[in-house]
Structures are given as C-alpha cells and as structure tokens.
Amino acid sequence: KVATTIDTNIVPLDSVTSPREAIPAKALNKTVSATGHYIANFRAPNQIDGAGKVSDWEVALMQIGTNSAILVVRGLWSERLLNPDIQQSMNIDVTGLLVASQFGDRAENAPGVISRLDSAVVTSLTDLDLYDGYILATSESTRDQKLERSRVTPEKLQSKIPGFYWQHLSY
C-alpha cells in the first residue's frame, strides 16, 4: 500500500488549479474550498473507498461562477435523499480533497450514471469549462446550515509497477 500525504490547510480551488488544464502535481491531495451550486447529479457505481468497501457514490456537478464547473463526490448514493431542501439555485460551500480523475471505467455510462470520476465523461452535458479531477467532499454547507451525511474516504492507490529483485539482475 502506498501512503498518500494529505495537506490539511484549506486553500481556494482556483488558487491551485484552473479549468481546462491538467491538475498540477502540487495541487493533488490538497484540501480545497469552493462555492457554487449543483447543476446535475450522477450515480457513480462500484467505487472503492479507503477501507476497500465497494459502493455507489453520489456525484454532483458544481457550477462555480458563471463559466466553470467541477465534479464533487458528495457521499453515498443511498443517502442522496437526506437533504431534500437543497435546490439548484442555492449556493453551497464545499470543502474537500482535490483528487485526480479516475482513468478506468467502473460501470457503463447511462443517463444519470457516470462510468468513472472524470470530468471528461460529462463534457457533452455542459458547455462550462471543467476542472480536471474532482473534489471528495468532507463538508458541505449552505448559508444557514451544515449538510450532515456520511462522507467517503479516498481509495488507497496500489502501485502497478512490479518489483525487481537482486537475483533477477544477476542473470
């Protein structure tokens, strides 16, 4: 297992990355904040959390300002109805971990379902400038209330590079 260092200082999303650009390496795993409103909701099936548990996650596309957006993992799909009073017109403050896009599909794309956590799979649904990667939300709040729900933890990444041993080098 590979240890991932997480920077817990909260920085504004637009101070570490920009829409339509690859996430700079120094921005990965930073704790970021963003304010916007959710304009679309998706189910992301077969996601694996930090404990190795497979479940479906709720992912929203958050519009930030007038012309950009980022995917936000809000929590478990099974808890998506916990905040029925959230409307698309409401501004939401999100804090969470900035994570690189997934590159392998976990499911098929279908209406309301995304195959992986990657803004590339929603480009046909919006003309907004999309940020690379996604925010794994640790907290969400509106002007007057904190949105309480279970939060998911980042998947532990496995190194795919095979090891070399001295006996292999001596032949």
Spans of features found by a protein language model:
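Surface-exposed, charge/polar-rich loops and edge strands
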Residues: 1-171
